[in-house]
């Protein structure tokens, strides 16, 4: 018996351009996820992408309007490419309208250089922009009238009102600088493309940074985004590799079966639960799952199977 584990679901805000995109599925999936007991629904963020890709904060606002209690979150918002004061207003509004359900996941991306060019932000500035932005964002959320005269932000007397409910900030990343930033500035970590051993090592580095920042006694969430293919057949792993882990072909993942077994969830419900337990054993407290197969009908079949065969054991802590 383990403690109950929270599990969220990535909304179908993106998918291959050769498929017909059904925008209505974002709202209906959010409603369904709330009804079956997912802890949160999440949306990814890109402004230039090879696939269909709906904007994250707009999609989450739509999902919030269709639900009442489920958490809503960005996994992850590319804050460094956006104007900070606008993001503060957008996210504070969303947190208020959703009665405090927003979890703000933030990352620096970089896998699609064209979108940074389109945003007018040099790739090399991503980390520095985030380091400057986060303390300012916290102060605005707290109701302060903020003055800034930094390298990337220059404004005076900027505040958000009404003051929003608390907005937990989760940061993504696994590079050394990212882990240091997470320990210093975040309420939680959203890991991705990492093995259980890697998750444990990164968690230890984050804790060391939290210790240095005097934050070790504060609440801290350890989350992980995992792509899954729930399939009992022997061909499941091969199929998942053929689908490129659930990412566009343009993203060169050098995917092979051995790599996939380490970094994704593939197989029967028991296989997936056993793998999830390995992450729980090294400190993971919340999962965000996303089907590898993004074709709309397949996506729906996959999340329904996950909700029926995997989610109940996570929620009740009865994996072992």
Residue ranges of model-derived segments:
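Internal, glycine-rich beta/alpha segment that forms the wall or movable "lid"
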Residues: 2-5, 83-185, 200-205, 211-212, ...
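Alpha-helix-loop-beta-strand connector modules within alpha/beta enzyme cores
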Residues: 54-74, 129-136, 303-320
